[in-house]
A protein has these predicted regions:
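Conserved SAM-binding loop of SAM-dependent methyltransferases across substrates and taxa
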Residues: 108-126
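Alpha-helical segment of the N-proximal tetratricopeptide repeat
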Residues: 328-338
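A short glycine-rich, Lys/Arg-flanked "PGG" loop and its adjoining helix->strand segment in the class I
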Residues: 222-234
């Protein structure tokens, strides 16, 4: 089965970019055995089935992707969206068209729904007019869960009960997202290695691509970034997970530092005229270093929603930015990847 396994691994990487190494091989072998048994075929025949049956290939990929996520993950980046990026884009747009936001690799929907809730707290019911939210993932199973929008306690790590009661209805041991939030996100299958995407997956102002690139090697990450650029408007912004950002500085897009946070910008980005915002041109020689694994626990990251829910502190009441001398610089931060 070793030669068949190697061929299957190569097929998976070619079609969707997933690199299966080390511990992932055990998961692959288990999935292959289970699927061969379910189809009543020999494991040696499974590769041929994968090549000819797109639905079966998707079923296998669904079993190989890890979809651990939760609401208001990395709240400082959501704060960046609500307090900085969204107001800036909306001011430039002057109400002519909604701001399009993509959650790429959205898993079961916690990320895009978190973005909706955070923006609803600031803009109220105007969110439906001001924004267009899309969630995309290669895993059709988790997309079905996202559309269903029913969650367990596991998705609310550190999220205060007031948030759940405001945006969710409790049903036995689960929480069902309220319709006014659920209806604002449209979910679509998204293969980031595909050469072309449908119109609904194009022309985004802001793309969140967080905690996904850890599954890909450096060449694949660069290809994915190049494909994401194609989905962005000329002044679009790409937000990558905090622990992944510097390892994704691959020469595709300029890296921006704003108030101690990093994101990538395309073309002539909408940047504030402040000394705390710096734009660095693309690297000419990307760093080959692997992505560092985040060690911060969920409990150490208070949910962004805690600062935004009705009756609590509004964005205008948030503490002032960190003093300039306490903010990381691009130079010092990049040393982490060398």
């Amino acid at each position: 089965m070793s030669s068949d396994t190697g061929a299957i691994k190569a097929l998976i990487k070619a079609r969707c970019g997933l690199s299966i190494e080390d511990n992932g091989e055990g998961l692959l072998l288990q999935a292959l055995t289970e699927r061969a048994k379910a189809l009543a075929i020999q494991t040696a025949s499974y590769y041929a089935r994968l090549v000819s049956d797109e639905a079966e290939f998707q079923e296998l990929v669904n079993r190989l992707t890890v979809n651990e996520t939760y609401f208001f993950r990395e709240p400082e980046q959501i704060r960046l969206l609500v307090d900085r990026l969204a107001p800036r884009f909306l001011a430039a747009r002057e109400g002519q068209a909604p701001l399009r936001i993509l959650s790429a690799g959205c898993s079961s929907g916690e990320e895009p729904y978190s973005l909706v809730m955070a923006l609803m707290d600031r803009y109220g019911q105007s969110v439906s007019r001001l924004f267009d939210f899309v969630g995309g993932d290669i895993d059709s199973t988790v997309l079905a869960k996202a559309r269903h929008a029913r969650y367990t306690e596991f998705s609310f790590r550190g999220v205060p009960a007031s948030v759940r009661s405001h945006y969710f209805d409790k049903d036995c041991q689960t929480y069902v997202l309220k319709p006014e939030v659920k209806k604002l996100v449209h979910f679509h299958e998204l293969n980031l290695l595909a050469d072309n995407q449908p119109t609904v997956l194009q022309d985004f102002d802001i793309i969140f691509f967080r905690n996904v690139s850890i599954y890909f090697d450096t060449p694949t990450r660069k290809t994915i970034q190049q494909n994401l650029v194609k989905l962005m408007k000329d002044d679009g912004v790409l937000v990558i997970g905090t622990a992944e950002t510097l390892a994704n500085d691959l020469g595709v897009l300029p890296l921006v530092q704003e108030d101690g946070l990093f994101y990538f910008a395309k073309g002539q980005p909408l940047l504030p005229e402040t000394s705390s915002c710096k734009l660095r041109p693309q690297r000419t020689t990307p760093s080959p270093k692997p992505i560092p694994q985040a060690t911060t626990t969920a409990s150490a990251q208070p949910p962004f929603a805690k600062l935004l829910i009705p009756g609590v502190r509004r964005p205008s009441e948030l503490a002032s930015p960190v003093p300039q001398d306490q903010k990381p610089t691009l130079t010092s931060a990049r040393q982490l990847t060398h």
